[in-house]
A protein has these predicted regions:
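N-terminal helical cap/lid subdomain that shapes the substrate entry/recognition surface
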Residues: 2-112
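Asp-based, Mg2+/Mn2+-dependent phosphohydrolase catalytic module
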Residues: 1-14, 26, 43-48, 90-92, ...
Length: 233
């Protein structure tokens, strides 16, 4: 019997990573950084110097406030505030520059397979988001699929820490091994879920065996196909 079909009867809730799991995040990040940099250029920074300036202020901020590494939004805003302060800009400018980044960051294209998968899973399982990113699922238009949404920073410590997984187990009132987590990253998603006592689905083309508690699929489409087989089983 298919391993997923054997596993799913014991699962009560399914969690999802977002970036590079439910959509391709690469171009979105490029576009968001470009939007941020265009806003910085308008304030007088030279395009060719922005990467170095940003890195310097990022390193300084992380050194002074390492806890911000669990909140990508707060960290980016603090870095922009540091740049603004160094250049004597008005306090509101950093927020405006961050907003340019954030708005572009929400322009993701959810995979058709992801929508179909969520539609089917929603009928039989509680669903969750556990993400280190700052995409707002409401703005993206998929919030209605999820019973809870946890984002690192506002809702807990960033993956691979177990914090948000444990909170999800508690919120759903389920045992650790009744939770299945789907993500693309070997450490932050698959290993993190297993460390929290749960099962993992790794969406990754790399041929890697993480043990019996992790099932690997090359694509989300492949995973969806097995889910549909289970639901029709």
């Amino acid at each position: 019997m298919n391993k997923l079909i054997e596993l799913l009867p014991s699962i009560k809730a399914v969690g999802f990573d977002l970036d590079d799991t439910l959509w391709d995040n690469r171009q979105t990040i490029i576009d968001a950084v470009n939007a941020q940099n265009e806003a910085l250029v308008k304030q007088g920074l030279e395009q060719e110097h922005i990467a170095v300036v940003y890195k310097e202020h990022l390193d300084k901020t992380v050194s002074q406030e390492p806890e911000l590494q669990s909140d990508v939004s707060a960290l980016r805003l603090r870095v922009l505030e540091s740049i603004a302060n160094e250049h004597g800009w008005e306090a509101s400018i950093a927020g405006n520059i961050y907003q340019a980044f954030y708005e572009a960051r929400q322009n993701v294209l959810v995979y058709d397979d992801a929508i179909e998968l969520l539609n089917h899973l929603k009928k039989d399982f509680q669903l969750a988001v556990i993400s280190n990113g700052n995409v707002d699922v409401k703005q993206v238009g998929i919030d209605h699929y999820f019973d809870l949404v946890y984002r690192a920073g506002p809702d807990g410590i960033a993956k691979p820490h177990q914090d948000m997984f444990v909170k999800a187990h508690d919120a759903f009132n389920i045992n650790d091994d009744e939770f299945l987590y789907v993500g693309d990253h070997i450490v932050n998603d698959a290993q993190a879920a297993m460390d929290a006592g749960s099962y993992a689905i790794l969406i990754n083309e790399e041929d890697i065996d993480l043990g019996p508690r992790c099932l690997r699929y090359k694509t989300l489409s492949d995973f969806k196909a097995d889910v549909l087989r289970y639901l029709k089983f």
